């Protein structure tokens, strides 16, 4: 299923936020080392479903050290900005610790797939410009 950017369901938006946090951290890790380790977003997924607002704040705090690393990297900065935009879309009334429905997983997966397609397109464009 393709990413639905018009979906305003609370669980779906929180799922997209989780995918953004994961991607920003993963990108910063890749800049520092080739070692692939589990991101904070991946480790916190179970807690995220039960207490999404509190876990989002925790993940935001854990991303802070990575932000200086990605300062000049447009793709990752855009993903961080998307995360902030999605939090804003939730609004105060939906930014709560009420547990998420299963729809969060669809938002998470769809956003990750959109990032994957974006990465593949970017690689394809950079390869064709080198030729």
Where are these regions (language model features)?
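Intrinsic-disorder/low-complexity detector
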Residues: 1-131
């Amino acid at each position: 299923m393709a990413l639905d950017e018009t979906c305003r369901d609370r669980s779906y938006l929180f799922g997209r936020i989780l995918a953004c946090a994961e991607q920003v951290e993963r990108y910063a890790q890749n800049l520092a080392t080739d070692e692939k380790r589990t991101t904070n977003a991946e480790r916190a997924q179970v807690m995220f479903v039960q207490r999404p607002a509190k876990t989002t704040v925790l993940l935001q705090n854990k991303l802070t050290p990575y932000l200086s690393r990605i300062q000049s990297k447009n793709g990752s900065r855009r993903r961080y900005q998307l995360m902030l935009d999605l939090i804003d879309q939730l609004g105060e009334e939906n930014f709560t610790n009420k547990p998420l429905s299963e729809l969060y997983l669809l938002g998470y997966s769809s956003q990750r797939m959109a990032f994957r397609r974006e990465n593949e397109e970017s690689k394809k464009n950079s390869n064709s410009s080198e030729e």
